[in-house]
Amino acid sequence: QIGVCYGMMGNNLPSANEVINLYRSNNIRRMRLYDPNQAALQALRNSGIELILGVPNSDLQGLATNADTARQWVQRNVLNFWPSVKIKYIAVGNEVSPVGGSSWYAQYVLPAVQNVYQAVRAQGLHDQIKVSTAIDMTLIGNSYPPSQGSFRGDVRSYLDPIIGYLLYASAPLHVNVYPYFSYSGNPRDISLPYALFTSPNVVVRDGQYGYQNLFDAMLDSVHAAIDNTRIGYVEVVVSESGWPSDGGFGATYDNARVYLDNLVRRAGRGSPRRPSKPTETYIFAMFDENQKSPEIEKHFGLFKPSKEKKYPFGFGAQRMQRLLLMSSMQHIPLRVTCKLEPSSQSLL
């Protein structure tokens, strides 16, 4: 259930072929790509890596206002690579909001989603490739307690029709979830262990649900917000989550290592509100990207541009090998691997 976002805002990053080989050698089987970079798509052929293919915000107007443009986009970036590239989702726009700096794009998100979906449907691929958009947590008006989660009143006219269309298209809503920003913005009320998945006990009791970590609480506030629209049941994909190693309050190597390790350990689990629905999650990001701003955005990578790992943990088979080694060195039975590593298939 774990993937990694492949951003390219750096002038010192490896080639696309090197990056895809790095994904494969580290058993990372899912990727989010923010635009249809042709070199990356070519490198992904026959890799077995499942893909979220992004539509940049700058392309939304053209796709929204002209169905032919959407058909051409799908032909060029989807059909030309399918099925050797396993495109699972198309994310039409990222973190667009009707309030704030991206408000101009908001008018185009739903019609762009509709036109891209219809272009995919015309090829009979709408069951294999789901069309959605990615939002951030600023669209949540109330998140505490999680069961009272709701979207902001001034975004409902924008978001409700999108959720309705996702319900019609049987597609999940993509949400970028960052406990780091919640913690760094309010360290007085949010403890670091709660943000890092290391709290030993329930921190927030919300009726029948108990929360030991902020990630689950934030995720369930989104689930509740969707439920509280009374539109219908729409699943959630966590399309970004990460922790920076430098550049801001609480942004340290150790905090990032602990958060990311625990996020990977969480793979295959649901949330208290939806325990039977494993949460598909994408870590932001593959590399530190030196052309991003502000400064903190430069430090989210799992890898350095040199392809050296920043943190000593792995995915899938790598994690199992590490646990077996630790078990043999310590002469203890490996009794917890089913919890740390739900199954090799769950990390595909």
UniProtKB/Swiss-Prot annotation:
GO molecular function, one term: glucan endo-1,3-beta-D-glucosidase activity
Alphabetical list of Pfam families matching this protein: Glyco_hydro_17 (PF00332)
Major site of localization recorded for this protein: other
Propeptide: 317-348
Annotated organism of origin: Phaseolus vulgaris
Induction details: By fungal elicitor.
Superkingdom classification of source: Eukaryota
Gene3D superfamilies: Glycosidases (3.20.20.80)
Name of the featured protein: Glucan endo-1,3-beta-glucosidase, basic isoform
